[in-house]
Amino acid sequence: MSVSKTNRIALFIDGANFYATTRTLGLDVDYKRVLKEFESRGTLVRAFYYTMISEDQNYVSLRPLVDWLVYNGFTVVKKVAKEFVDSAGHRKVKGKLEVELAVNAMELAKHIDEMFLFSGDGDFRSLVEAVQRRGVRVTVVSSFAAQPPMIADELRRQADAFIDLDTLRTKIGRDPSTRSM
């Protein structure tokens, strides 16, 4: 594949969905290698990472990753999860970042040629279609190889291209001998 450095690209990583997919695949992601891999595909305009944080834990477990991402070129979009107790007395966490991701994608569409959406969530099908109408090529990065598949069929069909995360294992997987993010 011939890649032009004038191809302006942006990454949109749905953190919760990406984490679930990589965990299902047993893939430990090295985010430095993610940047390197996608910078080789064009001029990286922006790399977004979307994540929920818990009110009571102040995102202690996510803090090292979030800090590393911020200091290494990612735009991290955080939202506090709303916690509640359902009618059965079970503690539930509610909150999504689909709207924030969609707004950022629509705003950035006029500045990019290609969007890489790291999510398998079918709720993004309409967003993909809207961005395509603005002349942006959309590649969805998720997994059909995972069991169960982590990509909604309608999202995969709408995208211009699909990359299975399993095929990127050697390019973005963490080298066990290193400790970088």
Task: Please report, for each region that a protein language model flagged, where it lies by residue.
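Domain-level signal for Mg2+-assisted phosphodiester chemistry and nucleotide/NA-binding surfaces
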Residues: 1-97, 107, 122, 137, ...
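Conserved residues at the C-terminal ends of beta-strands
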Residues: 50, 118, 165
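Ligand/cofactor pocket segment of small-molecule handling proteins
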Residues: 153, 157, 161, 166
